[in-house]
From Swiss-Prot:
One GO cellular component, as annotated: cytoplasm
Protein name: Cysteine protease ATG4D
Catalytic-site annotation from UniProt: C131, D356, H358
Native source species: Xenopus laevis
Top-level taxonomy: Eukaryota, Metazoa, Chordata, Craniata, Vertebrata
Function: Cysteine protease that plays a key role in autophagy by mediating both proteolytic activation and delipidation of ATG8 family proteins. The protease activity is required for proteolytic activation of ATG8 family proteins to reveal a C-terminal glycine. Exposure of the glycine at the C-terminus is essential for ATG8 proteins conjugation to phosphatidylethanolamine (PE) and insertion to membranes, which is necessary for autophagy. In addition to the protease activity, also mediates delipidation of ATG8 family proteins.
Reaction equations catalysed: [protein]-C-terminal L-amino acid-glycyl-phosphatidylethanolamide + H2O = [protein]-C-terminal L-amino acid-glycine + a 1,2-diacyl-sn-glycero-3-phosphoethanolamine; [protein]-C-terminal L-amino acid-glycyl-phosphatidylserine + H2O = [protein]-C-terminal L-amino acid-glycine + a 1,2-diacyl-sn-glycero-3-phospho-L-serine
E.C. number: 3.4.22.-
Compositionally biased intervals (Low complexity): 171-182
Molecular functions per Gene Ontology: cysteine-type endopeptidase activity; cysteine-type peptidase activity; protein-phosphatidylethanolamide deconjugating activity
Keywords per UniProt: Autophagy, Cytoplasm, Hydrolase, Protease, Protein transport, Thiol protease, Transport, Ubl conjugation pathway
Length: 469
């Protein structure tokens, strides 16, 4: 009798063939699941390593910068303090309280941790690389507050926050010294008390909405996720260093692609020149690009990237810089000391007041109606000598309409060509015409032009060299 093997029997009948196929499929599926499980395990381990690195970096960062949040800042009683166009005399007790309320009301955006991972990465924190983006966010937030509310608006909770105690230096001047001697260029007769808004419910709601727009979530129009995505247009990605000029162009793109503020446009100057006709087009809504022509830009944020020296800050620009910060239309300056971005909002004597984005805070879920606002406001003013400022920076101004822009240009021309200015050539120029046509894109915009000034050539470090690491 002929013997028949089981294998032959299986292949000799459709039923046997099907059973073999099922076993093979089950075996292959098992191997695939095993390999998939191993890959998932490796991915999970890599994610855990990245999270651990982020936590260690955040912890070290807060050890390095956290102590400065609680430090006392010394202010002089004999010199006025300027904060984004507002002037305060610390010889007057009520002025100190007004300054505190004004300062705390400025939006403070810092490193965050444990937010949803940035697209295409495992990064859940910007600690160590996102400081210039945060400075740009603070500048834009100030522009939105000015656009949607007013410069007089203050946060209703500002005075209820614990304000870090300052140590004003006692003035050696006699107590009877008139106010006219406390501020250069101002007399006691033209001094007017500051008018502060009482923090109406409408203002507080607008303020809360603005904070939502900057949330570290993919759906936020001005959040870190969106700005990093827009940065790819200019050759930047998450984890890269961003300079003040690149961030200016990212802010412009963020406003162009958003629907939250259709009556606001952003202009970035070319070759350190502000072209008035181009800005007038924005006021009229006559913009050749469809994405910027929505809703007739009735207000404009003007960003002017500049370089104030070679490898270090040139002190001849000190006068103009301080004069800009005295202007009510000034939105501040993004820049910083070398490899360390800061947002400058005022000055006293030869020291700049700033907000520091380097303190790392936990992610805040702004989808909740009553999300906490405290971490978006700083209660400790900091100062830095003007001479320590990095020469690469971006100035920002706001004009609500064409008439306002005309006044701004007149003021800027007086400052730029002031007899008190030590620099023969102005920081930037204002032209009546239009900029020549140029192709927008990564190649032309990722490396914005630097100012062309007469004089010997100086080796200049990259404007993107801003970070503390």
């Amino acid at each position: 009798m002929n013997s028949v093997s089981p294998l032959a029997t299986q292949y000799g009948s459709p039923k046997g063939s099907q059973q073999m196929e099922n076993r093979s499929t089950q075996s292959g599926g098992h191997e695939q699941r095993k390999m998939g499980h191993q890959d998932a395990t490796l991915d999970g381990e890599a994610d855990e390593v990245d999270k651990l690195k982020s936590k260690l970096l955040s912890a070290w960062n807060n050890v390095k910068y956290g102590w400065s949040v609680k430090m006392k800042t010394t202010f002089s009683r004999s010199a006025p303090v300027y904060l984004l166009g507002e002037r305060y005399f610390f010889r007057l007790d009520d002025e100190i309280e007004r300054f505190q309320k004004d300062f705390v009301s400025r939006v403070w955006l810092t490193y965050r941790r444990d937010f949803p991972a940035l697209e295409g990465t495992a990064l859940t924190t910007d600690c160590g690389w996102g400081c210039m983006i945060r400075s740009g966010q603070m500048l834009l937030a100030q522009g939105l507050l000015l656009h949607l509310l007013s410069r007089e608006w203050t946060w209703s909770e500002a005075l209820y926050r614990h304000f870090v105690e300052m140590e004003p230096i006692r003035s050696s001047s006699p107590p009877s010294m008139p106010l006219s001697s406390l501020a250069t260029g101002h007399s006691a007769g033209d001094y007017q008390p500051h008018t502060q808004c009482s923090g109406a419910p409408h203002g507080d709601q607008v303020h809360r909405n603005i904070m939502r727009w900057f949330s570290d979530h993919p759906g936020s129009p001005f959040g870190l996720h969106q700005l990093v995505t827009l940065g790819s247009i200019f050759g930047k990605k998450a984890g890269d260093w961003y300079g003040p000029s690149i961030v200016a162009h990212i802010i412009k793109k963020a406003i162009e692609t958003s629907s939250e503020v259709p009556e606001l446009s952003v202009y970035v100057s070319q070759d350190c020149t502000v072209y008035k006709a181009d800005i007038e087009q924005l006021f009229a809504g006559d913009v050749p690009h469809a994405e910027t022509s929505r809703g007739a830009g009735k207000a404009v944020i003007i960003l002017v990237p500049v370089r104030l020296g070679g490898e270090t800050f040139n002190p001849v620009y000190k006068h103009c810089l301080k004069e800009f910060l005295r202007m009510p239309s000034c939105l501040g300056i993004i820049g910083g000391k070398p490899k360390h971005s800061l947002y400058f909002i005022g000055y006293q004597d030869n020291y700049l007041l700033y907000l520091d984005p380097h303190y790392c805070q936990p992610y805040i879920d702004t989808s909740k109606n009553d999300f906490p606002l405290e971490s978006f406001h700083c209660n400790s003013p900091r100062k830095i000598s003007i001479t320590r400022m990095d020469p690469s920076c971006t100035f920002a101004f706001y004009a609500k309409n064409s008439e306002d822009f005309g006044k701004l240009c007149d003021h800027l021309m007086k400052v730029l060509h002031s007899p008190r200015a030590e620099e023969k050539y102005p920081i930037f120029s204002i032209s009546e015409g239009q900029a020549q046509e140029y192709a927008e894109g990564p190649q032309s915009s990722s490396h914005p032009p630097v100012c062309r000034k007469k004089g010997p050539l100086v080796k200049r470090p990259s404007s993107d060299e801003f970070e503390f690491l």
